Amino acid sequence: MLSNPKRTRFRKQHRGRMKGVSYRGNHICFGRYALQALEPAWITSRQIEAGRRAMTRYARRGGRIWVRIFPDKPVTVRPTETRMGSGKGSPEYWVSVVKPGRILYEMGGVSETVARSAISIAASKMPIRTQFVIAG
């Protein structure tokens, strides 16, 4: 199920900049294995969900998966063939702002080989370079 905030204070946001590295959310907290971002990017709720589904499908019933990012930034898109002006477009989808070092997914309760395979499948769904990390 695609995730987005239940309610926000404002409908639209500035685009912002992604400079520097992530100093929050860059340590493994819940599981034993994790997928860590190496590049800055906006990751859409669809991409997050695709990665989560791929990991869940590969791990079957064993193990537990934690998604450590949440899409809380609305991205607006103007209608096609619209002239300039007349305000900002309407919110179309949600993204999570990810900086280098950020943990995207965590996994526990499975062997390292299973975790490595599942996380590599999820990594292929991501628009950025990532690395497999082991806690400890």
From Swiss-Prot:
Belongs to the universal ribosomal protein uL16 family. NCBIfam families: rplP_bact. Gene3D superfamilies: Ribosomal protein L10e/L16. Its main location: plastid. HAMAP family: Ribosomal_uL16. Pfam families: Ribosomal_L16 (PF00252). One of its GO terms (cellular component) is mitochondrial large ribosomal subunit. GO terms for biological process: mitochondrial translation. It comes from the Eukaryota. It is found in: Plastid, Chloroplast. InterPro entries: Ribosomal_uL16, Ribosomal_uL16_bact-type, Ribosomal_uL16_CS, Ribosomal_uL16_dom, Ribosomal_uL16_sf. Part of the 50S ribosomal subunit. GO terms for molecular function: rRNA binding; structural constituent of ribosome. This is Large ribosomal subunit protein uL16c.
